[in-house]
């Protein structure tokens, strides 16, 4: 479906420079865009080469004034272009309706325009909102609730009593609501601790492929609004992750830790249990965090330390062999002096 630049500008709160009635049918990369496509020229490097793209229109910063081309000027070109791409991206959506090869339990309720693919298994008393999309092989346990516009990709399991908000996306192979890793020592044995809580995932959360988010021992494991996780992330029982936090691949968060808002946890970081990670904190890649982090602090290394201190420590590492040799020589000279 074609859209006019005027329609696009309204979508992204932008301003049209040029022909507002110009219609485009999609979005494309700068070098490949054609006359019926819109592209992104959000940085100085692309703006200098604006005559080299065949695009019918460009998304640009508000301070760009070249009027030779059709432009949509916005405050944040990258975010605006992402929204434009969402508008044109229909994906490979399966047809609306319930595939006859799906298995659905009693007390099922759903909204309008739901799509349930082959091999989906739905337990008892499950509720789906409008336009929910369940790809093949999805499993929903008893009493699961999913809000409007949810997309659950293939072979994902959402276990009993878990609750998902609106516009939640969960990628293939993730498990939501598995038992937490909880065992009580009893001599040489371990007694399993029942996990009777649930997982709550709020609006506009996107969970990567192969994630495992454990249900709470009591209460809830809580993934709050706008959180984005990369692939292969583990979030343990009773963890709370604050709004709009980013969790990169292979991060592990141990039980009962609270992660604040707008936090960045870089790849392969490990967070110990029962900690508080403050709002706007940044944890570097492969960091091992064993104590709480203050709001706004940037921490790196294992054990985690302030990032600047970690950089200083790392700068010393390469010189340690030479320092060891010098110390050995000094020890020999000192021994000679002591024998005097």
Swiss-Prot record:
Active-site residues, as the UniProt record annotates them: 237 (proton acceptor)
GO molecular function, one term: N-acyltransferase activity
Source domain of life: Bacteria
EC primary class: transferase
InterPro entries given in the database record: Hexapep (IPR001451), Hexapep_transf_CS (IPR018357), LpxD (IPR007691), Trimer_LpxA-like_sf (IPR011004), UDP_GlcNAc_AcTrfase_non-rep (IPR020573)
One protein family per Pfam: Hexapep
Protein name in the entry: UDP-3-O-acylglucosamine N-acyltransferase
Naturally occurring in which organism (per UniProt): Desulfosudis oleivorans (strain DSM 6200 / JCM 39069 / Hxd3) (Desulfococcus oleovorans)
């Amino acid at each position: 479906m074609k859209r006019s630049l005027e329609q696009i500008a309204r979508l992204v709160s932008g301003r049209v420079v040029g022909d507002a009635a110009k219609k485009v049918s999609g979005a494309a990369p700068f070098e490949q865009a054609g006359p019926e496509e819109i592209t992104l020229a959000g940085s100085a490097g692309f703006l200098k080469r604006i005559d080299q793209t065949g695009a019918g229109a460009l998304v640009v910063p508000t301070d760009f004034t070249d009027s030779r081309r059709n432009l949509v000027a916005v405050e944040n070109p990258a975010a605006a272009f992402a929204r434009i791409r969402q508008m044109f991206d229909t994906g490979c959506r399966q047809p609306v309706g319930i595939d006859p090869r799906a298995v659905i339990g009693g007390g099922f309720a759903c909204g309008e325009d739901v799509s349930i693919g082959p091999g989906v298994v739905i337990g008892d008393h499950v509720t789906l909102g409008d336009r929910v999309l369940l790809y093949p092989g999805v499993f929903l346990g008893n009493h699961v609730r999913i809000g409007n516009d949810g997309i659950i990709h293939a072979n994902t399991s959402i276990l009993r009593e878990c609750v998902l908000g609106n516009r939640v996306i969960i990628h293939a192979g993730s498990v939501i609501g598995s038992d937490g890793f909880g065992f009580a020592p009893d001599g040489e044995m371990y007694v399993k601790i029942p996990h009777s809580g649930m997982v709550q995932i709020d609006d506009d959360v996107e969970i990567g492929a192969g994630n495992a988010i454990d249900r709470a021992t009591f209460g809830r494991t809580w993934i709050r609004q706008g959180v984005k996780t990369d692939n292969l992330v583990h979030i343990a029982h009773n963890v709370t992750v604050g709004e709009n936090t980013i969790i990169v691949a292979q991060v592990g968060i141990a039980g009962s830790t609270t992660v604040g808002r707008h936090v960045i946890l870089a790849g392969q970081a490990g967070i110990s249990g029962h900690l508080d990670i403050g709002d706007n904190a940044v944890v570097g890649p492969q960091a091992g965090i064993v104590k709480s982090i203050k709001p706004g602090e940037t921490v790196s290394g294992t054990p985690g330390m302030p990032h600047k201190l970690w950089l200083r420590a790392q700068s010393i590492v390469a010189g340690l062999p030479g320092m060891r040799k010098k110390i050995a020589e000094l020890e020999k000279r000192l021994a000679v002096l002591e024998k005097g």
